[in-house]
Amino acid sequence: MTVKKIAIFGATGRTGLTTLAQAVQAGYEVTVLVRDSSRLPSEGPQPAHVVVGDVRQAADVDKTVAGQEAVIVLLGTGNDLSPTTVMSEGTRNIVTAMKAHGVDKVVACTSAFLLWDPTKVPPRLQDVTDDHIRMHKILQESGLKYVAVMPPHIGDQPLTGAYTVTLDGRGPSRVISKHDLGHFMLRCLTTNEYDGHTTYPSHQYD
């Protein structure tokens, strides 16, 4: 089945905005759940449907997932590094809604810290990483066709489409641009190659 209708959670974040733009340009009919619709771009590619709400509210998530064929999860906490359950709570609601609506494909972004030595996580990032771990466990136990995307440092370099994807956290570099990361999230919708895997996209930028 060719996926055409997708929901993006976290569409107003750094990677979310470029993923949203690339998805619309690629012809997807995109629904987004946002807390504040003013954070969506005022010009350029627009989502087909906007649900204003909170990923921690099951009813808001259910409304967003209804009628979709796949889901992209780019939840984050921005620059807030305090203890959080937003990403895991949101993911639990997304999984529940997907099962309720018969949607079985989800591509979700966490972090390469889940692939690397846990003792090497910088202390200031430990709380966010702990929630990424909870989020990943929910995906693993979901029974859905999930792709766990675990990027290294996310940069602002231009789109190349020439990144390397490995399954073990080792690659040509410890950076991926937000544009290439978005490109990879969308690529995962067109293949089953990475279903059930942890993936590490990276690229040696000039």
UniProtKB/Swiss-Prot annotation:
Pfam families attached to this UniProt entry: NAD_binding_10
Phenotype caused by lack of the gene: Adult mice do not show defects in biliverdin degradation or hematopoiesis. Impaired cytoprotective function in stress hematopoiesis, characterized by divergent erythroid megakaryocyte fates. Defective stress erythropoiesis is observed in spleens and in bone marrow erythroid development, in conjunction with defective lipid peroxidation. Mice on high-fat diet gain weight more slowly than wild-type mice and are protected from diabetes due to improved insulin sensitivity.
Phosphoserine: residues bearing it: S42, S82
Organism domain of life: Eukaryota
Binding site for NADP(+): 10, 12-13, 15, 35, 38-39, 54-55, 75-76, 87, 109, 132, 153-154
EC code: 1.5.1.30, 1.3.1.-, 2.6.99.-
InterPro entries, per database record: NAD(P)-bd_dom, NAD(P)-bd_dom_sf, Polyketide_Oxido-like
Disulfide bond entries: none
Record GO biological process: heme catabolic process; megakaryocyte differentiation; negative regulation of insulin receptor signaling pathway
Molecular-function annotations in GO: biliverdin reductase [NAD(P)+] activity; FMN reductase (NADH) activity; FMN reductase (NADPH) activity; peptidyl-cysteine S-nitrosylase activity; riboflavin reductase (NADPH) activity
Entry keyword set: Cytoplasm, NADP, Oxidoreductase, Phosphoprotein, Transferase
Residues the record marks as active site: C109 (s-nitroso-cysteine intermediate), C188 (s-nitroso-cysteine intermediate)
Gene Ontology annotations for the cellular component aspect, listed alphabetically: cytosol; nucleoplasm; plasma membrane
Keyword Transmembrane helix: no
Role description: Enzyme that can both act as a NAD(P)H-dependent reductase and a S-nitroso-CoA-dependent nitrosyltransferase. Promotes fetal heme degradation during development. Also expressed in adult tissues, where it acts as a regulator of hematopoiesis, intermediary metabolism (glutaminolysis, glycolysis, TCA cycle and pentose phosphate pathway) and insulin signaling. Has a broad specificity oxidoreductase activity by catalyzing the NAD(P)H-dependent reduction of a variety of flavins, such as riboflavin, FAD or FMN, biliverdins, methemoglobin and PQQ (pyrroloquinoline quinone).
Record note on quaternary structure: Monomer.
PANTHER family according to UniProt: FLAVIN REDUCTASE (NADPH)
Family named by the database record: Belongs to the BLVRB family.
Name of the featured protein: Flavin reductase (NADPH)
Source organism per UniProt: Mus musculus (Mouse)
Lineage: Eukaryota, Metazoa, Chordata, Craniata, Vertebrata
The gene coding this protein: Blvrb
